[in-house]
Swiss-Prot record:
GO terms for molecular function: intramolecular oxidoreductase activity, interconverting aldoses and ketoses; L-ribulose-5-phosphate 3-epimerase activity. PANTHER family: ISOMERASE, L-RIBULOSE-5-PHOSPHATE 3-EPIMERASE ULAE. Induction: Induced by L-ascorbate. Repressed by UlaR. Belongs to the L-ribulose-5-phosphate 3-epimerase family. It comes from the Bacteria. The keyword Isomerase applies. InterPro entries: L-Ru-5P_3-Epase (IPR004560), L-Ru-5P_3-Epase_Enterobacteria (IPR023492), Sugar_Epim/Isomerase (IPR050417), Xyl_isomerase-like_sf (IPR036237), Xyl_isomerase-like_TIM-brl (IPR013022). Keywords: Isomerase. SUPFAM superfamilies: Xylose isomerase-like. Catalyzes the isomerization of L-xylulose-5-phosphate to L-ribulose-5-phosphate. Is involved in the anaerobic L-ascorbate utilization. This is L-ribulose-5-phosphate 3-epimerase UlaE.
Length: 284
């Protein structure tokens, strides 16, 4: 029987770096998490995962089976380097090839959701043409995802093009495809001038997972929990009252910390206390 407990996961980059997924999932289990989100970022090392052999892919599947800690989602931020909106045809083609490989990888190892970075371009100047190319690239990507039965979910970003659920919903309506949904980050959403509760309510029915982190205006990473502007209890209450029952993912970048596990445990306890106050989980 499936548990009625709210699934709580941890981002791969919060845990010690390395390529042994069995060790990573064992640690996540020890820390009390239900799942780990994989990162495929713009570095060559993590991009290389998309070219894993059959044996390497099976090793991940085996690690999930052995630990019962799932890897249901992938944070695909590689499109910073190879954006779908690039005016360079070769760069854009590489971005689409990364998408194709990511979808195939997800299909092979059981990943259900690929979180997309909402950048038309990142290191270049955006314009009408980059936005048009981005839209067309999303359409092509969602067509591929549909055939593979893999969900593509747009993150709410640290970037004006996609800094609210309302903006992401515009793309959802444009694409009009059940395999394209939303994966909001309550930290990013709160760092902009958004009515956060209204935005969360507007996204219900399209939200497949939620990133949990703290932020400040203009500071989107490495803000310790409790030192930023996010009203966590209110966000959790709004999502609960709106009927959201999906997973929450603590997003951290503590893989290079002196003691990543201790940092993660501290953040886990802090977040779960706010979840308990909002009625999402039982108090410890």
């Amino acid at each position: 029987m499936l548990s009625k407990q709210i699934p709580l996961g941890i981002y791969e980059k919060a845990l010690p770096a390395g390529e042994c997924w069995l060790e990573r999932l064992r640690l996540a289990k020890t820390l009390g998490f239900d799942f780990v989100e994989m990162s495929v970022d713009e570095t060559d090392a993590r991009l290389a995962r998309l070219d894993w052999s059959r044996e390497q892919r099976l090793a991940l599947v085996s690690a999930v089976a052995e630990t019962s800690v799932r890897v249901p989602s992938m944070c695909l931020s590689a499109h910073r380097r190879f954006p779908l909106g690039s005016e360079d045809d070769a760069v854009r083609a590489q971005g689409l090839e990364i998408m194709r490989k990511a979808i195939q990888f997800a299909q092979d190892v059981g990943i259900r959701v690929i979180q997309l970075a909402g950048y038309d371009v990142y290191y270049q100047q955006a314009n009408d043409e980059t936005r048009c190319r981005f839209r067309d690239g999303l359409k092509e990507s969602v067509d591929m995802a549909s055939r593979a039965q893999v969900t593509l979910a747009m993150e709410i970003m640290d970037y004006p093009l996609m800094n609210s659920i309302s903006k992401a919903l515009g793309y959802a309506h444009y694409l009009n495809n059940p395999w394209f949904q939303l994966y909001p980050d309550i930290g990013n959403l709160s760092a902009w001038d958004n009515d956060v509760q209204m935005e969360l309510q507007a996204g219900i029915g399209h939200i497949v997972a939620v990133h949990v982190k703290d932020t400040k205006p203009g500071v989107f990473k490495n803000v310790p929990f409790g030192e930023g502007v996010v009203d966590f209890e209110r966000c959790f209450e709004t999502l609960k009252q709106s009927g959201y029952c999906g997973p929450y993912l603590i997003e951290m970048w503590s893989e290079t910390a002196e003691n990543p596990a201790a940092e993660v445990a501290k953040a886990r306890d802090w977040v779960k206390a706010r979840m308990a106050s909002a009625g999402l989980v039982e108090a410890a």
